[in-house]
């Protein structure tokens, strides 16, 4: 497919609308699995890689996820008035934002490789810092293997731990390293990684 990319279009549907439909469609074949899938879905994903990372963050461990708190996805953030004259953007929409943890995550694709795009990424990082938000950019290298995904998830766990109870880090580390969860995470990546984003030797 080719053509102009159009942004900010309204979504065709929402998780709430899908769940509402399934509530009234109990006689359909596959209804139980469809309701389960709707329960795991989230509104706001803007790309296949965002969808992959969302599932790695939030699915139950038996399905390859960490079962972290659900982030907001591509929801505009308003900056505090005291920094409005300092930031480069008056609002931003991080791919993922956890308000409780004051953390944002964004996937950086190939369109972030030019000098202009790199400057924009630097401005975004500084804006997050000025507003007291920890910023975690990810690239396809961070998703090129289960081990790489696990390493990034471990960084998020370290960031989130001070906001949680004393058992949080222990539970998350168990999920990171449990052999059954590692296998499920590998299966998840094999199913969701788009061919265009797969890591090749020439990317090193």
Model-derived segments and their meaning:
Residues 8-204:
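Surface segments flanking catalytic/ligand-binding clefts of nucleic-acid enzymes
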């Amino acid at each position: 497919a080719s053509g102009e990319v159009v942004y900010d279009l309204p979504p065709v549907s929402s998780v709430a609308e899908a769940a509402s439909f399934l509530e009234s469609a109990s006689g359909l074949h596959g209804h139980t699995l469809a309701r389960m899938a709707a329960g795991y879905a989230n509104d706001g994903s803007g790309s296949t890689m965002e969808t992959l990372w969302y599932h790695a963050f939030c699915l139950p461990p038996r399905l390859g996820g960490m079962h972290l708190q659900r982030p907001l996805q591509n929801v505009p953030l308003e900056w505090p008035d005291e920094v409005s004259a300092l930031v480069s953007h008056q609002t931003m929409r991080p791919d993922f934002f956890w308000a409780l943890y004051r953390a944002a995550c964004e996937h950086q694709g190939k369109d972030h490789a030019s000098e202009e795009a790199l400057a924009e990424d630097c401005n975004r990082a500084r804006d997050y810092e000025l507003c007291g938000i920890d910023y975690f950019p990810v690239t396809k290298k961070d998703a090129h293997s289960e081990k790489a995904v696990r390493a990034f998830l471990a960084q998020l766990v370290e960031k989130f731990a001070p906001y949680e109870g004393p058992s949080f880090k222990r539970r998350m580390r168990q999920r990171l390293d449990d052999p059954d969860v590692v296998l499920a995470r590998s299966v998840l990546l094999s199913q969701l990684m788009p061919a265009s984003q797969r890591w090749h030797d020439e990317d090193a």
